[in-house]
Curated annotation (Swiss-Prot):
PROSITE patterns documented for this protein: G_PROTEIN_RECEP_F1_1, G_PROTEIN_RECEP_F1_2
Taxon lineage: Eukaryota, Metazoa, Chordata, Craniata, Vertebrata
Main location: membrane
Name of the protein: Olfactory receptor 5P73
Disulphide-bonded residues: 100-192
Top-level division of the source organism's lineage: Eukaryota
Organism from which the protein derives: Mus musculus
Keyword annotations: Cell membrane, Disulfide bond, G-protein coupled receptor, Glycoprotein, Membrane, Olfaction, Receptor, Sensory transduction, Transducer, Transmembrane, Transmembrane helix
GO biological process: G protein-coupled receptor signaling pathway; sensory perception of smell
Family label: Belongs to the G-protein coupled receptor 1 family.
Pfam families listed in its UniProt record: 7tm_4
Compartments reported by the entry: Cell membrane
Cytoplasmic face of the membrane: 50-57, 124-136, 221-240, 296-330
Amino acid sequence: MAFLEDGNHTTVTEFFLLGLTDDPVLRDILFIIILCIYLVTVSGNLSTILLIRVSSQLHHPMYFILSHLASVDIGISSSVTPNMLATFLVKQNTISYIGCSIQFTSAAFFGTVECFLLATMAYDRFVAICNPLLYSTKMSTEACIQLVVGSYIQGFLNASFFTLSFFSLFFCGPNRINDFYCDFAPLLELSCSDVTVAVVITSISAGFITLTTVFVIAISYSCIFITIMKMHSTESRCKAFSTCTSHLTAVILFYGTAIFIYVMPKSSYSTDQNKVLSIFYTVVIPMLNPLIYSLRNNEIKEALKRHLGKKVFSYGNLFCKTHYNHNYPV
């Protein structure tokens, strides 16, 4: 039941997601592609977390933050992808009122945390390159924990603002959302009540997060580039810059896509283009992050080789012992 009679009012109890396409063949193809991406996302980020936990050489502030970034990437993808895959299977694109609020609230929470973690990693690179002698003090274990906890608190606050704004709205008419998941902007268009307060509150919250994190990232990298340009040897410049390329790539992908979705005027691109960008933002980027950080980071690659080598060596020893005992019993 999509509507509930409440006295003289009709209340929406569920929303209908128009999804990505109506073509049944294309839906099946998209299901397979997105399922594969989701499996790679979860396995890749879990592998990153486990590798950082078990590798003593990766027990540094940057990798501590990276492990939380990997957890958040799983959260962002999981807030949208499982429900989207389910709609592909059951051919039923409805989501309950509460389910809709949970979906966009979790997306807002994890998206906010990712913004602050990316800003924290930029600050980490700034201290490492511009103030290396103070690195152990400014990026101590206690400082890292405080920065990460602060990121989660900001995520909780922003998600709370969006949740309270959502429950202050009244839905009595159309319930069709032209998207594949419950985003806050399309919900505002469906509301029968005045959305001014909700728009102001969420805009201030999202604006504060965006401006704060972009400011920290911009200032950090400005100082980093100035410091790198002052280095005398080309080798030192390349080495310093190589420590930033992975993070800078992740920042450009994340914020670049977010700007197109939430900042650019809707008239500048079509709804279908917006859906593609949203897929990239919520599904593809969480898969790319572990690849970006692992393929361009020598310490992670060395740790991965070392642990894979140990596994191969231990399995080889086990095979040899089994083979020896089988052929030459005592």
